Amino acid sequence: PHFFAGFSGGRKSILPGICSQETVNENHSYKAISSPYANTGVLEHNPIHEDMLAAAKMVNVQFIFNVALDGQKKIIAAWAGDLEKAHAEGVAFIRKWSQCPSITGDIVVTSNGGYPLDQNLYQSPKAVATAEACAGEDGVIIMCCSCADGMGGTHFEKLITMGTVDEIDGYLSKIGRAHV
């Protein structure tokens, strides 16, 4: 799963994989990420997924090879072939083996699973987004993240050190308008 593209694999090897920074910024824009469909496990109507798929089709991807990893990062399954068909098969496998009934708790402890997934603070919301579904109302989420590479970029550092929620919201709205 991917916390705003729905699932990893397939079209992600093109976007963000080999695209320009400008294209990645547009795909990862506030406007796109703020869509209610830009969420873990959601592909239908997901603007980020749809944009990634359009980019992959634009360059006429003929073949993909994707794998699923276990907790020890060992390959447990693989899919190859048509961009959409092979990706759909992988998604079905992941849905079957990774989804479980939701359990809520007052305190949820989470991580991204180690380097490079927790390389900086910018990457950390992935763990929080997943934990959010498990935290009860007024629950507490404790995120464990090494951040070996620091904050994750000057723009991100500026955003999280801005101050008030209104200042942050204004900044994000400005960014959203710039990427319409």
Label each region the model flagged.
Residues 1-101:
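Conserved, well-structured core segments that form the ligand-binding/active-site neighborhood
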Residues 178-180:
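Conserved small/polar residues in nucleotide/adenosyl-binding loops
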Residues 6-10, 17, 41, 71, ...:
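Residue-identity detector for glycine
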Residues 33, 37, 71-74, 84, ...:
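A sequence-level detector of short, solvent-exposed, charge-rich linear segments
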Residues 92-164:
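Long, well-ordered mid-to-C-terminal structural blocks that present hydrophobic/aromatic surfaces
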Residues 15-32, 125-143, 159-176:
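Gly/Ser/Thr-rich active-site loops/lids in small-molecule metabolic enzymes
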